[in-house]
């Protein structure tokens, strides 16, 4: 059984949804980044969604772009990211760990080589933000070869054919966008998404996690009430890092408290 399947079964039995924080690995530097991941787990994160820093993150707003810049300026490489992931995996053998990244990072290797290294580091899933569903075949083939779940985005304006394709190709979970555009806590998630959730379930998609603009417990609660399996929050988490760069201990405590608050909102 995959770690995602086990997680969703456990949460359903406990009448809870999932809360999944996102950060960019290496932000603000590799050593602190590892402490940040530990702080998120301490707060009760059900899974992790982690970015590998990239110089041109087109799907991201300024907050996560700045996180990638800080990570790159601290000389974070894909190899360093995999080292950090390996250590986190060794300490937390049951925690689902997903990567959210851009195709160029895969192409600096071959898809097969990248997914082989990801598997060795303990990665469960990969979402490639800038690859459309219809162009994802070589990536999915490499992911399947190494037993890594392929995550696909269900956009808010998707028609039934798109949702059927997403449902057919996805494994692990479905990333449901609350709104169009780039990432960012400044632009709130737009509810309702009930019709998309109903269609995804009808088409047999894996559980949906709602992302983009999730920054408050009320939004997590609304997502789960609408039928999502949980919520992903990125920019709101990264803002805590950004606003506390000169006070690392305060930053870690605020991150843990934020996750606790968001996780508490997942109780059904």
From Swiss-Prot:
Q: What class of enzyme is it?
A: lyase
Stated EC number for the protein is 4.2.1.20
- Which pathway does the protein contribute to? Amino-acid biosynthesis; L-tryptophan biosynthesis; L-tryptophan from chorismate: step 5/5
List UniProt keywords, sorted A-Z.
Answer: Amino-acid biosynthesis, Aromatic amino acid biosynthesis, Lyase, Tryptophan biosynthesis
Catalytic residue positions: 49 (proton acceptor), 60 (proton acceptor)
Any one GO MF term held by the record is: tryptophan synthase activity
| Taxonomy, superkingdom | Bacteria
Q: Which Gene3D superfamilies match?
A: Aldolase class I (3.20.20.70)
Q: Which reaction does it catalyse?
A: (1S,2R)-1-C-(indol-3-yl)glycerol 3-phosphate + L-serine = D-glyceraldehyde 3-phosphate + L-tryptophan + H2O
Q: Name one GO cellular component term.
A: cytosol
Q: Which InterPro entries match?
A: Aldolase_TIM, RibuloseP-bd_barrel, Trp_synthase_alpha_AS, Trp_synthase_suA
Q: Which family does it belong to?
A: Belongs to the TrpA family.
Q: What function does this protein fulfil?
A: The alpha subunit is responsible for the aldol cleavage of indoleglycerol phosphate to indole and glyceraldehyde 3-phosphate.
Annotated protein name in UniProt = Tryptophan synthase alpha chain
The organism encoding this protein is: Tolumonas auensis (strain DSM 9187 / NBRC 110442 / TA 4)
Origin organism lineage: Bacteria, Pseudomonadati, Pseudomonadota, Gammaproteobacteria, Aeromonadales
